[in-house]
């Protein structure tokens, strides 16, 4: 499974929300993510992709859409 498909699956599993049709929509504004959800998402991303997301790199504006999450995970996997 590619990064995009897996990120979509993780968001769906955690938040019961299919974001495949809203990849560029702000997930906070859409009510998908909140502060607790963000923590859950980071933990799951770290476990599934064997990455570490530094707090300094997880700004809301940098990871607020599914596409930005995919980009962030991809960058951390390639680091």
UniProtKB/Swiss-Prot annotation:
Gene Ontology MF, one: D-alanyl carrier activity
Listed pathway(s): Cell wall biogenesis; lipoteichoic acid biosynthesis
Coiled coil regions in record: none
Compartments where found: Cytoplasm
Record PTM: 4'-phosphopantetheine is transferred from CoA to a specific serine of apo-DCP.
Family: Belongs to the DltC family.
Function (record text): Carrier protein involved in the D-alanylation of lipoteichoic acid (LTA). The loading of thioester-linked D-alanine onto DltC is catalyzed by D-alanine--D-alanyl carrier protein ligase DltA. The DltC-carried D-alanyl group is further transferred to cell membrane phosphatidylglycerol (PG) by forming an ester bond, probably catalyzed by DltD. D-alanylation of LTA plays an important role in modulating the properties of the cell wall in Gram-positive bacteria, influencing the net charge of the cell wall.
Name of the molecule in the record: D-alanyl carrier protein
Positions of the Carrier domain: 1-77
Gene assigned in the entry: dltC
Lineage: Bacteria, Bacillati, Bacillota, Bacilli, Lactobacillales
One GO biological process term: cell wall organization
UniProt organism field: Streptococcus gordonii (strain Challis / ATCC 35105 / BCRC 15272 / CH1 / DL1 / V288)
């Amino acid at each position: 499974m590619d990064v995009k498909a897996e990120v979509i699956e993780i968001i769906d599993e955690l938040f019961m929300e299919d974001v495949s049709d809203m990849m560029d929509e702000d997930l906070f504004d859409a009510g998908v993510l909140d502060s607790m959800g963000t923590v859950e998402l980071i933990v799951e991303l770290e476990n599934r992709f064997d990455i570490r997301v530094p707090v300094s790199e997880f700004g809301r504006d940098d990871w607020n859409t599914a596409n930005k999450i995919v980009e962030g995970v991809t960058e951390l996997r390639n680091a």
